[in-house]
């Protein structure tokens, strides 16, 4: 009988020891996971701070550039280029969001002004395209003739 008790107690001690080792391994792995998550949070925090600093620097540089450009006198050529860029941006906006662009452009206009506005836009878009096509056809006709 004593032998059975010794074996049973030994078995209980061995299983308790195995469970404690298993629990230690789990707690170590959980601790490792928590440490990894914490280090990732720190890295993300640092990355976020760097990005916000870059955004602030870019905004400041853009504002400085804009204020420098706006406060100096522009030449007629620069003014014309800016007007063309603004027109191109409006045309691109109207292509992306035609309903909003037409609403924005037609606010406060009567029907005649609306018709004139759209014909001006068509001329502005079609004029350069037709000019290029006519130049290309003229060049082909000269080569053939």
Swiss-Prot record:
It is found in: Secreted. GO terms for cellular component: extracellular region. It holds the Pfam family Bombinin. Keywords: Amidation, Amphibian defense peptide, Antibiotic, Antimicrobial, Cleavage on pair of basic residues, Cytolysis, Fungicide, Hemolysis, Secreted, Signal. Expressed by the skin glands. Residues 1-18 form the signal peptide. The modification Isoleucine amide is found at residue 144. Residues 19-43, 74-124 form a propeptide. InterPro entries: Bombinin (IPR007962). This is Maximins 3/H9 type 1. It comes from Bombina maxima.
């Amino acid at each position: 009988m004593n032998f059975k008790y010794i074996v049973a107690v030994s078995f209980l001690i061995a299983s308790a020891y195995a469970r404690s080792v298993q629990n230690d391994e789990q707690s170590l792995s959980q601790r490792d996971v928590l440490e990894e998550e914490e280090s990732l949070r720190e890295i993300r925090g640092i990355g976020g701070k760097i990005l916000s600093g870059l955004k602030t620097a870019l905004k400041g540089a853009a504002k400085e550039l804009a204020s420098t450009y706006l406060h100096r006198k522009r030449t007629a050529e620069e003014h014309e280029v800016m007007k063309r860029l603004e027109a191109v941006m409006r045309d691109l906006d109207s292509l992306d969001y035609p309903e909003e662009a037409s609403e924005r452009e037609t606010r406060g206009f009567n029907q005649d002004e609306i018709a004139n506005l759209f014909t001006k836009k068509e001329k502005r878009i079609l004029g350069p395209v037709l000019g290029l096509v006519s130049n290309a056809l003229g060049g082909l006709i000269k080569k053939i003739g």
